[in-house]
Swiss-Prot record:
It comes from the Eukaryota. Residues 17-27 have a biased composition (Acidic residues). Residues 1-96 are annotated as: Disordered. Residues 58-79 have a biased composition (Basic and acidic residues). InterPro entries: Cms1 (IPR032704), P-loop_NTPase (IPR027417). This is Protein CMSS1. SUPFAM superfamilies: P-loop containing nucleoside triphosphate hydrolases. It comes from Danio rerio. Belongs to the CMS1 family.
């Protein structure tokens, strides 16, 4: 059997073995780079990925810090702009300015601007206060008692002659209830035997004040323009026996505001003046003093 096969078997066997070896070598060669390359690639991919992430985070942190550093000066500049744009209040203006004593011109101009909105030109002329309507003004050196002694030299005589109820001889107008109490304390050396009444809205009803004015003779009243205006409107207080109207013009509160610097108080003061006080001043029966 072996002889019959002859050389062909061997040749075929030899030829058949060669390609198998070649195929195996080729497969081995093909397998080696496939196995080696992915391993190398995996290692190469893992290392740069980690480093790249670190570098990216570092770069991001750098950019964030740069952005924050760039934002800070912008915020500071915006704050400075806001500070610059802040408007001055009345308190800031008044504290920076020197106190100037009030004059008759101040009250006349205030009444003129008020009446120009609601009155005709002819009516405005009839409501204009002349210089003869005013007493000498406080030059910021007087206390209340010393000022009243100067402008009311015959106070003792006038006090005795006053017999009317629901009326006073001296009416002092100020901006608040606390200031009212303070001024009443300052009247001790001036008032003598005169009866003093406080007129403000805090804890005291209008009806109670009307009763107290009608019961007996009151010589001096100190109060706020809002309550005095309400009493004049209800005729609980009249101007028949009134001779002196003193406005607490120059006093400044904790915020450096005068009575006419507070809008509500100023409005009440102007309304109060229209309740027969301007007319009495023009007739010469009442004199105005700016303390």
């Amino acid at each position: 059997m072996a002889d019959d096969l002859g050389d062909e078997w061997w040749t075929q066997g030899d030829n058949s073995d060669v390609p198998e070896v070649e195929e195996e070598t080729e497969h081995a060669e093909e397998k080696q780079p496939i196995k080696s390359t992915p391993k190398k690639r995996k290692v190469e991919k893992q290392i740069p990925d980690a480093t790249k992430k670190k570098k990216a985070t570092v770069k991001k942190e750098c950019f964030i810090t740069q952005e924050r550093s760039e934002e800070k000066p912008d915020n500071e500049s915006n704050k400075n702009k806001k500070r610059r744009k802040k408007k001055k209040t009345i308190t800031d203006v008044l504290t920076s300015s020197k106190p100037v004593p009030g004059s008759p011109v101040d009250l006349v101009s205030l009444l003129k601007t008020y009446h120009s909105q609601t009155r005709s030109v002819i009516e405005q002329e009839e409501l204009t206060l002349q210089d003869s309507c005013f007493l000498s003004c406080n030059d910021l050196t007087h206390s209340l008692s010393s000022y009243l002694k100067e402008v009311c030299p015959k106070w003792a005589k006038m006090q005795k002659q006053h017999t009317q109820t629901s009326s006073v001889v001296l009416l002092i107008v100020c901006g608040s209830a606390l200031r009212t109490i303070d001024l009443i304390k300052q009247l001790v050396t001036f008032k003598g035997q005169a009866k003093v009444l406080k007129l403000f809205a805090k804890h005291i009803k209008v009806e109670e004040q009307i009763k107290s004015l009608s019961k007996g003779v009151t010589h001096i009243a100190v109060g706020t323009p809002g309550r005095i205006c309400a009493l004049l409107e209800k005729e609980g207080l009249t101007v028949q026996g009134l001779r002196y109207l003193v406005l607490d013009w120059n006093y400044r509160d904790q915020k450096q505001r005068r009575m006419v610097d507070v809008p509500e108080v100023k409005g009440d003061l102007l309304k109060m003046m229209d309740q027969g006080l301007i007319q009495s001043c023009r007739e010469g029966t009442v004199k105005i003093g700016l303390f």
